[in-house]
Amino acid sequence: MKILADENMPYVQQLFGDLGTIETVNGRELTPEQVKDADVLLVRSVTKVDQALLAENNRLKFVGSATIGTDHIDLDYLASHNIPFSNAPGCNATAVGEFAFIAMLELAQRFNSPLKGKVVGIVGAGNTGTAVVKCLEAYGIEVLLNDPLLEQSGDPRDFVSLDTLIEKCDVISLHVPITKTGEHKTWYLFDEQRLNSLAENTWLVNCCRGEVIDNRALIKFKQQRDDVKVVLDVWEGEPNPMPELVPYVEFCTPHIAGYSLEGKARGTYILYQKLAEVLQISADKQMESLLPALWSERVLVQEISDERALLQLARFVYDLRDDDELFRKQFLNNQGFDHMRKNHTHRREFSALKVGNTGQTNVNWLSNLGFSGVEL
């Protein structure tokens, strides 16, 4: 059995190696010729899987995408050809949630404006949006949710309209899929008009899809409204963001919010489990055995007295400033955007760090934030 996998998917050899011959490829440049004799195709969001890509293949047994979204997959085509498909919903939700939370802490530090006491609006309350909520509520932050589709589906949580969210929130974090049609389309959800409606000193964080914000309109807006602070992990026109936008963004990264080692491993592992179901074989490997130990497995904490201390603890796991600096230096280089994504292999989730409490202050709330082994 031939397994064709994106070269940037981790742990493919360890998980799938016993099932067949593995060939890794550049997912953004995948061709029908490469795919024609594959039995299994494993991709990420950079690969569009449709009739054009699969036209020469008549033996495909499974397509897996190590992503939450499926907008790059022609699901109707796969179904019409009886090709089993699985994505990995929620695989990197924790990573995205922690990334957005860390970005807010970094903004708070840079502009001397504490996150504590702000109201945060989450646009899109699915897996990733909910993961942000978990971090924020663990820290005692008030959160408002906007997600008309979930609201209409009967989700029991409280929701507000987008206009209400914009009016009442100090911070807005975007976590929607990209949809181009329909009553609740998200393509250019934040267009010129909506950007201009943002309250003074709003923070806007986008970790979902670049086209949710009209990037050209954002440049014009930021030229007039420097009070609004912006964090972009995703960009219109990836992998070639508008160079003129970058100077107006407070923190820039190359679509890596979900790129923790845990999130990547989780995505590959979900596909391993799904393929085992399709092949009707036992999935006997364990994800935990794949992950390396953190450089420091345990940090002793006397107290978390302020946000500066919390941010310092978070930086033990991930320092956003490093990726921001690297992005500004490399994104204009040949294939710089994709090069940074491919080599983003160092980030961990809070759970990788054990926190020991040596003081009298209660820091047990850190376990709700995701840190492991919080001890008295």
From Swiss-Prot:
Q: Which residues of the sequence carry a binding annotation for substrate? A: 45, 67, 259
Enzyme nomenclature, EC number: 1.1.1.290
The free-text function statement in the UniProt record for this protein reads:
Catalyzes the oxidation of erythronate-4-phosphate to 3-hydroxy-2-oxo-4-phosphonooxybutanoate.
Q: Which residues bind NAD(+)?
A: 147, 233, 258
One GO biological process this protein is involved in is: pyridoxine biosynthetic process
Molecular-function GO terms, alphabetical: 4-phosphoerythronate dehydrogenase activity; NAD binding; protein dimerization activity
Superkingdom: Bacteria
**Pathway(s) annotated for this protein in UniProt:** Cofactor biosynthesis; pyridoxine 5'-phosphate biosynthesis; pyridoxine 5'-phosphate from D-erythrose 4-phosphate: step 2/5
List the protein's name: Erythronate-4-phosphate dehydrogenase
Catalytic residue positions: 209, 238, 255
The entry's cellular-component GO terms read: cytoplasm
The record's subcellular location field reads: Cytoplasm
Alphabetized SUPFAM superfamilies for the sequence: Formate/glycerate dehydrogenase catalytic domain-like, NAD(P)-binding Rossmann-fold domains
Enzyme class, one word?
Answer: oxidoreductase
- Any idea which UniProt keywords this protein has? Cytoplasm, NAD, Oxidoreductase, Pyridoxine biosynthesis
Q: What is known about its subunit structure?
A: Homodimer.
Record-annotated membrane-spanning stretches = none
Positions of disulphide bridges: none
Q: Which CDD domains match?
A: ErythrP_dh
Q: Which reaction does it catalyse?
A: 4-phospho-D-erythronate + NAD(+) = (R)-3-hydroxy-2-oxo-4-phosphooxybutanoate + NADH + H(+)
Q: Which family does it belong to?
A: Belongs to the D-isomer specific 2-hydroxyacid dehydrogenase family. PdxB subfamily.
